């Protein structure tokens, strides 16, 4: 349990940020799954649209500090590799 007023506020902020971060990460996982299914279906248009949505979400996650920029670069590289390989 936090002892000082500032520690109580920091704990409250930590919980709030944790919830936000989990939401963003869950959205990224969902978009990645949609991308994988679009690629497996073989439809180029839906694959490209899913790739754009996923990369946009990854960039927004980097901007808000949820994901490190190197992790995002690796994820976007992976997307380009699987979408544009065909």
Swiss-Prot record:
Keywords: Ribonucleoprotein, Ribosomal protein, RNA-binding, rRNA-binding. The keyword Ribonucleoprotein applies. This is Small ribosomal subunit protein bS20. Belongs to the bacterial ribosomal protein bS20 family. It holds the Pfam family Ribosomal_S20p. It comes from the Bacteria. One of its GO terms (biological process) is translation. It comes from Opitutus terrae (strain DSM 11246 / JCM 15787 / PB90-1). Binds directly to 16S ribosomal RNA. One of its GO terms (molecular function) is structural constituent of ribosome. Coiled coil: none annotated. InterPro entries: Ribosomal_bS20 (IPR002583), Ribosomal_bS20_sf (IPR036510). Residues 1-21 are annotated as: Disordered. One of its GO terms (cellular component) is small ribosomal subunit. The keyword Ribosomal protein applies.
